């Protein structure tokens, strides 16, 4: 799935992703697949796996999409 980061609080380590008309999807820093400091910025486009937990929708295996222009 592909969505857009609505907001992410680096100090608290979590935020939310917007995907189509679904409710906001929770994302925790531990679900971000990248080396180094795991954070996201508002407006980042990300690919992720969606799971449903007792607390609602949650993103897993989150990766930033690198867009290229020609």
Say what each PLM segment does.
Residues 2-31, 36, 61:
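S1/OB-fold single-stranded RNA-binding interface
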Residues 51-70:
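OB-fold/S1-family single-stranded nucleic acid-binding modules
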């Amino acid at each position: 799935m592909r969505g857009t980061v609505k907001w992410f609080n680096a100090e608290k380590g979590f935020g939310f992703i917007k995907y189509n008309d679904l409710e906001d999807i929770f994302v925790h820093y531990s679900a971000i697949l990248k080396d180094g400091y795991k954070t996201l910025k508002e407006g980042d486009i990300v690919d992720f796996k969606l799971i449903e937990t007792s607390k609602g929708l949650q993103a897993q295996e989150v990766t930033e999409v690198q867009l290229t222009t020609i």
